[in-house]
Amino acid sequence: MNEVLNAIKSRRTIRKFKPDSISEEKIKAILEAGRWAPSFSNLQPWKFIVIKDQKIKKELDKVAKETVLHLGINEAPAVICVCVDRRIDPLHAIESGASAAQNMALAGHSLGLGVGWIGTFGTDAEKGIQKLLQLPETTRVIALLPVGIADESPKGSRKPVEEFIQFR
């Protein structure tokens, strides 16, 4: 099977991490994958914040508790906060940020790391994260991506393709 399709099909959201650190080289490779995500008119409205400080991660975990799947923030050696500046692209920034987050999740997986995905957009947690990280109101927080060495291997499942695809 094609490497990209294999990565897409085998990637899982990870919520449990080993305490081992990860290299700066791998973090930079993940960020580089986000940088190459598609964006409307190539506006690239994103900003990526890498959080390693345990104190900040603890606060981030408290703020993110509103989201159902906030697990992994404290345990992961790094958390990437994916943001977009809606002044740059008010209509498509969210899609661009989600594309960048997906690229980073796939890149982390391809590098042998586990990556979580905590959706924060439009929640009270988003406002708390903006405040904690001192982000301007024009910056939207799309997702938090805890990154590290996975301490779990969740099984994946999907609906049959016939349930949601139409050809006309």
For each feature predicted by the language model, list its residue ranges.
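Acidic, surface-exposed loops and disordered segments
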Residues: 1-168
